[in-house]
Amino acid sequence: KLQLGYGGDTLNTALYCARLGVEAHYVTALGEDARSQWLIDEWRGEGLGVSHVVRIPNRQPGLYWITTDAKGERSFSYWRGESAARQLLSAESTLTRLSVELVTYDLVYFSGITLSLFDQQGLERLWALLRALRGASVRIAFDGNYRPRAWASKELAQSVFAMALRHSDI
């Protein structure tokens, strides 16, 4: 049985915060296609703030497929190569906008999955954003969620995670 849904570590965290009555907003990039709009509408319906969702033409949401075996073990297949989220910080204007908008927040949360989406330029922009937010007393929480297939090597992931920890409070 095939079932359509949405999820992921950072999205699930934001959704559960919203369901608990905590004001939560999601920062990501989506395309301008119907599936992207459906996601925004669904998240908004869950009470999640979507004003920081960047829309990128000619891109679509990433996709993953979960298969569950007879013992209940899950395995994942990913199609994220052309996802809009990979381009979230590609424009300097988006970085500037997020630096201004997110300084009013108490906490910003990101994960190892987030890190795996960005190239070196995207990571440098993320570090700059996190430095700006910490400088404005926003607490930064890092979830070290690690998926080996998302990284070119274990050593690269370790290096990037070490940098993430240097930019985090929690």
What are these regions (language model features)?
Residues 4, 29-30, 119-120:
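Residue-level marker of alpha-helix boundaries and capping positions
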